């Protein structure tokens, strides 16, 4: 439901749903789902403009993904892009970072081990939509 609200632009509802998932005791038993939820949480906070909190969330997400051996190249590319964007001053830099992310994700899409990430969320399509918005 959180992904549904995010894709439709209802970021506050997406945040409410993702917070409900984080409060659930069952989320800890599904590492794949928790990793996806943490990545989606980063995107939600980016979209609602919580850039100060995003810096902390990025560090916590990277630590979690590395500890569970779920820190793949796709996640690294998205997180590195978000790190650069929250420090960016103008939209030109932000747009350039999203263009670089799209190119990197396009090349990663060909990798067998990285292509499965699109089952949970299509980061390439999201980055291309962000370029159009800017």
Per-segment meaning from a language model:
Residues 4, 44-45:
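Residue-level signature for tetratricopeptide repeat
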Residues 33-36, 75:
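Start-of-helix signal in alpha-solenoid helical-repeat scaffolds, especially tetratricopeptide repeats
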Residues 16-27, 60-70, 103-109:
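Amphipathic alpha-helical segments of tetratricopeptide repeats
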